[in-house]
From Swiss-Prot:
Protein name: Pre-rRNA-processing protein IPI1
Gene (UniProt): IPI1
Subunit structure as annotated in this protein's UniProt entry: Component of the RIX1 complex, composed of IPI1, RIX1/IPI2 and IPI3 in a 1:2:2 stoichiometry. The complex interacts (via RIX1) with MDN1 (via its hexameric AAA ATPase ring) and the pre-60S ribosome particles.
InterPro entries linked: ARM-like, ARM-type_fold, Ipi1_N
Family recorded in the similarity comment: Belongs to the IPI1/TEX10 family.
Further facts: Present with 4420 molecules/cell in log phase SD medium.
GO cellular component: a single term: rixosome complex
Species of the source: Saccharomyces cerevisiae (strain ATCC 204508 / S288c)
């Protein structure tokens, strides 16, 4: 009996039932009833955005794989700077956006430059607080394997010097000079010239002009005080540089004893001479103008004067920038 009943049930699955007039079609046994009405649907771990203007959730988009998303995110933050300049969002914003100095897209890098200009025009002190991170990634860009990233590195340096030049030259005077020499292809003291970029006439003159202008600004901030930059009076500068200032005055900048490195740990450089890095210069504190000028005269000035003479003879925009740099060097060191 049981076997015959199962056979009948199996046969019913393959039989087409006759529809009767006036009666609806029967529903399947596994049909789901969707006729219920609910006022709310609760989904775990999913919440509606209560504040559509909250920019903290956009920070992760700065690491998005799409170039347009990164660019649009930088533009959004740039437009929002006036309203968030005094908020706690600035620190994570700069921490997430500064690595874009080495971004593969030129549009993203230009968007970051515009963002830095917008922040600096509202409050330059914020850029000064993140000066170390800026210098770190600028140095990385100067030695980057991609030529375009390397060429744009001095753009970031020029814009950073415009808002916090004194902070930059005090902390990384020698490193930045070595980096600018590298992108110009001039070779540095203690290094092989073939290791740097070879300077040829085929190189884009536009980028050479940008590099020379960045070097001009770096030397201007590193070897001149604020009064000399504004007035252009060299006599007062040389007179004041030799006088002993009151050591008990409140310093003009934060962390005046940072160069002593009392609470920092540094990695030991093994065989620094063989690697081509002058460890003495890199560890030298360049807090004052006199020290920076002495380092520049001893290590960099002869090379700069030799190279700019060649560029001046070639003429063009590069020649103008080189002549401008030559005038500055004569004003400071002659």
């Amino acid at each position: 009996m049981t076997k015959s009943r199962k056979q009948k049930q199996k046969k019913q699955d393959f039989l087409r039932k006759k529809l009767k007039v006036g009666k609806p079609k029967e529903k399947a046994r596994n049909a789901t009833d969707t006729s219920f009405v609910s006022k709310t649907i609760s989904i775990r771990n999913q919440h509606l955005d209560q504040n559509p203007h909250d920019l903290t959730k956009r920070l992760t988009l700065l690491k998005h794989h799409n170039i347009n998303v990164r660019k649009e995110t930088l533009t959004t933050f740039q437009k929002s700077i006036p309203s968030i300049i005094k908020s706690r969002l600035m620190t994570p914003l700069l921490t997430q956006s500064i690595p874009l100095i080495c971004d593969e897209s030129q549009q993203v890098r230009q968007g970051l430059i515009d963002l830095v200009d917008e922040i600096g025009s509202h409050d330059a002190e914020i850029l000064k607080l993140h000066c170390n991170i800026f210098v770190l990634y600028i140095n990385m860009a100067m030695t980057h394997i991609v030529t375009q990233i390397q060429a744009d590195s001095t753009k970031f340096l020029s814009h950073l010097l415009k808002y916090c030049g004194d902070e930059v030259v005090r902390k990384s005077w020698v490193k930045l000079l070595n980096g600018v020499f590298g992108v110009l292809g001039w070779g540095q003291v203690g290094k092989n010239d073939s290791a740097s970029i070879v300077q040829t006439k085929k190189r884009n003159a536009k980028y050479v002009t940008i590099h020379l202008n960045a070097l001009y600004t770096l030397v201007e901030y590193g070897c001149q005080d604020e009064r000399a930059r504004s007035d252009g009076d060299t006599a007062e500068t040389t007179e004041d540089s030799g006088t002993l200032r009151n050591p008990y005055l409140i310093p003009d900048y934060p962390q005046p004893f940072e160069h002593l490195k009392l609470f920092t740990r540094e990695l030991k450089v093994q065989d620094a001479t063989s690697s081509g890095v002058n460890a003495t210069l890199l560890s030298l504190a360049t807090q004052d103008i006199d020290t920076r000028k002495a380092v520049f005269i001893e290590q960099f000035l002869p090379i700069v004067r030799k190279k700019i003479e060649v560029i001046i003879k070639e003429g063009g925009e590069c020649g103008k920038s080189a002549n401008k740099l030559k005038t500055l060097l004569a004003k400071i060191f002659d």
